Amino acid sequence: MRKIYAALMTAMLVCVGCEWHFTSSDDDAEGTFVVERYDRIESLYLTTGDFSALQQMKTGYPQQTRALIEDVLKIGEVNDPEINSKFLDFYQDTILQALIMSVEQEFANIDDVNKELQASFQRLQQMMPGLELPQVYAQIGSLDQSIIVGNGMLGISLDKYLGTDYPLYLREDYGYTEKQRSMMTRQYIVPDCIGFYLLGLYPMPTDRKLSQVERDLHIGKVQWVVNQALGRRLFNTVFTRTVERYMKKHPTVSVEQLLKNNNYKDIR
């Protein structure tokens, strides 16, 4: 199993927050499930210091901005009188300015992401009737979390999906392994969105200490469901195969029942 992926998915769920609210060229169809481009307003402010962009971030995207400042960057509280200058100064680092430009270029168009995201969540809703869709937006972080989940909202840090060979990812001081970098591509945006969202809804139990096998099985359940939502087998591990065998033997078990079942002995 991709233990690094499992570890990342588990760790990243500690950061919560977020929402969606911006009219852009990628949001041209009413009722279409798309990624909201909060990152564009963020980029405008961080590269030009445009005060109107900052105001739009705060008034149009208050929860995203709070999550970015307090939970992702951890540079202070959003109500701090000095937070505007702290926020702008933080991104004046030449590396982060280059990161912003790379995100703007790589993700100028995300129609492919929107298309796969909508199709995948539609499949997920078919498997899990009544599942509420998250509000999804994109942001630019600082190479920390990939996906931010909380309160029915889901934020994508585009700076973590610039490609396996993106120069910053290759630097030793960032410490990314080859396996980690293999998943830092735009092809993993939608799988990560679904996986993190499901882990937020169906977290590992905290009322007892889990063995490593139990933890791997929990991630295996989520990854198996992600495969079904994607319509392809992206994750093919001993644990996803274990879950697949279990579901074939128990055709009356729903996906929701599978995810809620934390008695891992039933699945092994």
Spans of features found by a protein language model:
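N-terminal mature-domain "stem" immediately C-terminal to a signal peptide or N-terminal signal-anchor/transmembrane
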Residues: 19-89
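Sec-dependent signal peptide recognition
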Residues: 2-9
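Acidic/His-rich structured neighborhood in mature extracellular/periplasmic domains
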Residues: 87-268
